[in-house]
């Protein structure tokens, strides 16, 4: 069963919805480690302070699947050349989308 907030389109969930879902997933924060809370928050709402790495392009993270996002974080830490190559592809795809919309 997937307890994540359903994201329609590209709009990020609002803070209240994220807090409610965090409470359902993690319970009271003082009952759990902050690491578990931060990991859950990262999955629900891509906020930079809760990231494990300096993954910089988070504004298009809604375009990526959860698996792709995890793989990018892994590549950022272990294979920076492949990470840079993939991020350049993501940037180029974003530019193409913006041109089509605009």
Residue ranges and their predicted role:
Residues 1-34, 53-55:
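Short, charged surface segments at domain edges that flank catalytic/cofactor-binding sites
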Residues 58-60, 66-102:
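A detector for short metal-coordination/catalytic motifs
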């Amino acid at each position: 069963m997937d307890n994540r907030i359903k994201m329609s389109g590209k709009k990020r969930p609002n803070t209240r919805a994220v807090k409610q879902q965090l409470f359902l997933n993690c319970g009271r924060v003082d009952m759990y480690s902050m690491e578990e809370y931060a990991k859950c928050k990262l999955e629900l709402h891509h906020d930079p302070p809760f990231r494990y790495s300096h993954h910089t392009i988070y504004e298009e993270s809604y375009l990526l699947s959860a698996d792709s996002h995890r793989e990018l974080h892994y590549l950022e830490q272990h294979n920076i050349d492949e990470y840079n190559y993939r991020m350049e592809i993501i940037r180029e795809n974003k530019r193409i989308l913006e041109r089509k919309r605009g």
